[in-house]
Amino acid sequence: FKNGKKYSVSGVPKVTVRGQGGLMDIELHPNFQENNLIYFTYASDEGEGSGANTALMRAEFKENKLSNQKVLYKASPNSRKGQHFGSRIAFDKNGFIYFSIGERGNRDENPQDITRDCGKIYRLYDDGRIPEDNPFVNTENAKKAIWSYGHRNPQGMEINPFTGEIWSHEHG
C-alpha cells in the first residue's frame, strides 16, 4: 500500500505454504534508503529432500519489483513436517544479519546437533558470507553460520538497542 492504494510487487520468491510454513519475515536493510535491499525468510521446497525448509533471501526493491534475488541460506534437508519453520530476521549495529530457524518438529535432535540446520539462530554478513568469528567456524562438520543453538521455534527476535544482546521468543 502507498497513499492508500494497493500495488502488486513482482519478482517475489516462490513461497511454499505447508502447515505453519509460508512467508515468515521481511526486514529492510539498515541502509535501505541507499541500497534498496530487503530480506525475507520463507518456506522453500528447493534443495535436498521432499517437503520444505526455511530460506533467507536478499533482493533489491525498486519500483514495485524485486530484482537481484539471492538465497543467502537454505536449511537442509527439507522436511514433510508442517511445523516450526521459525523465523525472524534482525540486524545488529555492526550490520550483521541474524535469522532463526525452528526445529521443524524434531525437538529432541535438531536443536542440540550443530551438524543440523534446524533449531538455531544464525549470523551472517549482509551479503551471505559467514563471519570468521562465528562460534563454530572451526568446528568440523558444524553448520558454520550458527550463532546459537538449542532453540525450539524462535518466532520473535530483536536486538537490544542499548546492549546489543539478541532477545528471542520461543514457542512451546
What are these regions (language model features)?
Residues 106-110, 141-148, 155:
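Active-site rim elements
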Residues 36, 117-118, 125, 129-132, ...:
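Sequence-structural signature of mature extracellular/luminal beta-sheet repeat domains
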Residues 54-65, 112-127:
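Beta-propeller blade signature
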Residues 19-20, 81-82, 140, 147-151:
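Conserved loop/turn at the beginning of each blade in beta-propeller domains
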